[in-house]
Curated annotation (Swiss-Prot):
Pfam families, sorted: Homeodomain (PF00046), LIM (PF00412)
Noted disease: Deafness, autosomal dominant, 7: A form of non-syndromic sensorineural hearing loss. Sensorineural deafness results from damage to the neural receptors of the inner ear, the nerve pathways to the brain, or the area of the brain that receives sound information. DFNA7 is a progressive form with highly variable age at onset and severity, even within families. The age at onset ranges from congenital to mid-adulthood.
Name of the protein this chain belongs to: LIM homeobox transcription factor 1-alpha
Residues of the LIM zinc-binding domain: 33-92, 92-154
Primary gene name: LMX1A
BP-aspect Gene Ontology terms: axon guidance; cerebellum development; dentate gyrus development; dopaminergic neuron differentiation; locomotory behavior; memory; midbrain dopaminergic neuron differentiation; negative regulation of neuron differentiation
Lineage: superkingdom: Eukaryota
Lineage: Eukaryota, Metazoa, Chordata, Craniata, Vertebrata
Annotated tissue distribution: Isoform 1 is expressed in many tissues. Not found in heart, liver, spleen and testis. Relatively highly expressed in fetal brain. Isoform LMX1A-4AB is expressed in testis.
Primary role: Acts as a transcriptional activator by binding to an A/T-rich sequence, the FLAT element, in the insulin gene promoter. Required for development of the roof plate and, in turn, for specification of dorsal cell fates in the CNS and developing vertebrae.
């Protein structure tokens, strides 16, 4: 009975001992680590620890040049880099020479761009800008105040429109150096002869690319200009100046064509006016020598005025009164030779026939032949 109890006690103590030992082992053994580089479980005897993450020895290498890292390394976006590649990829670069800027170098800042002291100069006259000088940051290039004003004057001469000669969408306003305190006075350098700007000569392919883009949009955005500059191998500034000159050229041609159309219209109007004026003047010259014929009312007035004193009707034989057959038309001795000579009748007839051709007015008033025959009949019947 005691032996059984001792065995049970020994068995129970053995179980407790094994449980406590397993608990100790569980605390001592750490969970398996995962490599930060390849995301695999680390089964190697030795490992490397970087920024609270575990790495295989073979995974600790530069992500750019694939060289193993032994002493120092740079960590960015869960990747490792050597010093050279890290500075090449992520270090601050100069806005002028696009080279990395060392941490111990002095710099000049213009808005978001950083420059070496030697690179902080005007791109036209290459004069180094000092503290307090006024300048313009245009298309990532620095322009001093004098060269900027000259460029605007040239653009205004080429293109008088305010839209072309004004600032572009990405052109910054006139500003001062970031390190300047107060408004400084820039050196004008009027006596100094500045070197002339090099003239850019476009090739056929570059000109075709520019014209194709100009047909799509005469005023492209900044991204399109940067794309054209990358395709043609030119600077963005050259691309912008070409588009400005092309817009000015098209406007000049449009104004010239409009002026020609106006001149042509004015010439046509003048010619038509001269034609109409000459025709009317010619007709007036033709009609002026001829007087207008009298109207029937005027003819009737003439009849009444001429024969208002005649008591007899027109074309009828006057009444035969005693002693009046010799002078039926008044007391005037118009036919005093009728009895002396018979041939005088024929002469009188010829005279009246000659006078009958005077015109339509006399024929309408009365024919003297009728009066002559009536007088002759009355003479022979009496």
């Amino acid at each position: 009975m005691l032996d059984g109890l001792k065995m049970e006690e020994n068995f129970q103590s053995a179980i407790d001992t094994s449980a406590s030992f397993s608990s100790l082992l569980g605390r001592a053994v750490s969970p398996k680590s995962v490599c930060e580089g390849c995301q695999r479980v680390i089964l190697d005897r030795f490992l490397l620890r970087l920024n609270d993450s575990f790495w295989h020895e073979q995974c600790v290498q530069c992500a750019s040049c694939k060289e193993p890292l032994e002493t120092t390394c740079f960590y960015r976006d869960k990747k490792l880099y050597c010093k050279y590649d890290y500075e090449k990829l992520f270090a601050v670069k100069c806005g002028g020479c696009f080279e990395a800027i060392a941490p111990n170098e002095f710099v000049m800042r213009a808005q978001k761009s950083v420059y070496h002291l030697s690179c902080f100069c005007c791109c036209v006259c290459e004069r180094q800008l000092q503290k307090g000088d006024e300048f313009v940051l245009k298309e990532g290039q620095l322009l001093c105040k004098g060269d900027y004003e000259k460029e605007r004057e040239l653009l205004s001469l080429v293109s008088p429109a305010a839209s072309d000669s004004g600032k572009s969408d990405d052109e910054e306003s006139l500003c001062k150096s970031a390190h300047g305190a107060g408004k400084g006075t820039a050196e004008e350098g009027k006596d100094h002869k500045r070197p002339k700007r090099p003239r850019t000569i476009l090739t056929t392919q570059q000109r075709r690319a520019f014209k194709a883009s100009f047909e799509v949009s005469s005023k492209p955005c900044r991204k399109v200009r940067e794309t054209l500059a990358a395709e043609t191998g030119l600077s963005v500034r050259v691309v912008q100046v070409w588009f400005q000159n092309q817009r000015a050229k098209m406007k000049k041609l449009a104004r010239r064509q409009q002026q020609q159309q106006q001149d042509q219209q004015n010439t046509q109007r003048l010619s038509s006016a001269q034609t109409n004026g000459g025709g009317s003047a010619g007709m007036e010259g033709i009609m002026n020598p001829y007087t207008a014929l009298p109207t029937p009312q005027q003819l009737l007035a003439i009849e009444q005025s001429v024969y208002s004193s005649d008591p007899f009707r027109q074309g009828l034989t006057p009444p035969q009164m005693p002693g009046d057959h010799m002078h039926p038309y008044g007391a005037e001795p118009l036919f005093h030779d009728l009895d002396s000579d018979d041939t005088s009748l024929s002469n009188l007839g010829d005279c009246f026939l000659a006078t009958s051709e005077a015109g339509p007015l006399q024929s309408r008033v009365g024919n003297p032949i009728d009066h002559l025959y009536s007088m002759q009949n009355s003479y022979f019947t009496s």
